[in-house]
Amino acid sequence: MRGKLILEDGSSYTGELLDGNAKTVGEVVFTTTMTGYQESLTDPSFCGQILTMTYPLIGNYGTAAKFMQSRRPFVRGFVIGELCDAPNNWQSEKSLIDFLTQNKVPCLYNVDTRAVTRHIRAAGSMKGVIVSDGTEPDEIAALQAEELPRDLVAMVTTPEVYVMETDQEDAPHIAALDFGVKRSILENINRLGAKITVLPAYTSAEEVLALNPDGIFLSNGPGDPQDVPEIVAEIQKMAGKKPIFGICLGHQLLALAFGAKTYKMKFGHRGGNQPVKNLRMNRVHISAQNHGYAVDPASLEGTPLVITHTNVNDDTVEGLRHTSLPIFSVQYHPEAAPGPDDNMYLFDEFWALMKGE
């Protein structure tokens, strides 16, 4: 069935609906990653959003359980060019069509995603709806008027504490606050030789410190960091008690905890090819990113935080370090999935802080 994506500024893009009855509303964003569509669909950082893939052919290698980054897809919709109906890969367990259908993800395909992307780049990310061609105007208007949820972290965090053990002797114990963490991040930390206790996002500082971890990890996640002031308050209580490493949303929350400010970007950074300059090393690394908010560099004046990394494309803040405490953060995902692994050295830095080096 024919369908369309209608943005809040009135622009409209036609395509085919995978499920003719599907309709949805969300913030329309795009990612430039060429592969890793299943990882993107199941990345909790995309919660509440309609995801547009810029690469023209999606689904050609199918899907598999091993590529899941969370318990289910959290996107509100999926907009793509060509949808492959005959995947071919030795790891494939089911087609992308079956995956989207079984998980009830509204998908609009055969869309001019280049046009969608160019419009978002020019006008900025905005609210949009996916509907079938026959949808009544009143129904479209009601969908467009729907208020999107704000505390997205509460929707994606783990409901209970769980532990990832390791066989390595003298392994550090890391308390990971789950704001929407990707499975690959935890698996990489665990594989490096760490016991991880994964905690719900709203765990109190007292409960975290009662575990006596060697370090605290603040994960990635969706939404506006200013929508979760309770978490910021708990981070303030933990500062100086244990080494802390934050990524993505965790990076933004750390900045807020020390008095800096964040702002909404025009269209964000989403993809596996963002160049980041490490100012201390004077080297550029390619990073995987998924965020629509950033730390305001002007607001760092008077705080104990210094900029350690910047984005080569737009000079936005990509990394921070505390001047006296064992605390640092980056705006991107060090382990990628999908994307490059140029930045795995950051975990080595975290290990060094936990050892007091």
Give a label for each model feature.
Residues 319-356:
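A glycine-centered loop/beta-turn motif at secondary-structure junctions
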Residues 1-206, 210-211, 225, 337, ...:
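RNA-binding accessory domains that recognize and position tRNA/RNA substrates
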Residues 168-174, 281-284, 322-327:
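Beta-strand-turn-beta hairpins that frame and shape the catalytic cleft
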Residues 34, 290-295, 331-339:
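Glycine-rich phosphate/pyrophosphate-binding beta-alpha loops
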Residues 215, 220-286, 294, 339-353:
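Cysteine-nucleophile active-site neighborhood
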Residues 171-175, 195, 243, 286, ...:
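Residues that mark the start of a beta-strand
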Residues 106, 173, 243-245, 261, ...:
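Proline-centered loop/turn at the N-terminus of a beta-strand
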Residues 283-325:
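Catalytic beta-strand/loop cores that center a nucleophilic Ser/Cys/Thr
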